């Protein structure tokens, strides 16, 4: 086996939306609790959505692998897509070590621009 160390550099803001226990409860029971306390600042809201490991921002390994697999739809090998609707060649080629991959940064700021996620 060959180990290769890579660094992924983003060119656009990173959108994180961790699936919390509160969201899981709302999804399974259909009931969401309204927090009637003080409204959270944008920074506090964003902090709740971050994946954290040892008090540092990170990304789960399955999320990175799924992103790479999805990106395979746009790459072809001999006129054949690396990833199709049903299967992908990518998991047979490599794996990513670790469970939570650190986001190495000097800090972060909240991007408060409105986001439209296409359906």
How would you describe each model-predicted region?
Residues 1-119:
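RNA-interacting cores
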């Amino acid at each position: 086996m060959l180990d290769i160390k890579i660094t992924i550099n983003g060119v656009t803001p990173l959108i994180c939306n961790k699936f919390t226990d509160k969201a899981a409860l709302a999804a399974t029971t259909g009931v969401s609790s309204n927090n009637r306390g003080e409204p959270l600042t944008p920074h506090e809201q964003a902090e709740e959505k971050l994946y954290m490991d040892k008090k540092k921002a990170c990304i789960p390994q399955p999320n990175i692998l799924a992103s790479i697999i999805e990106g395979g739809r746009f790459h072809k090998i001999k006129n054949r897509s690396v990833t199709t609707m049903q299967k992908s060649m990518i998991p047979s080629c490599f794996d990513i070590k670790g469970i939570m991959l650190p986001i190495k940064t000097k800090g972060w700021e909240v991007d408060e621009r409105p986001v439209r996620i296409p359906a």
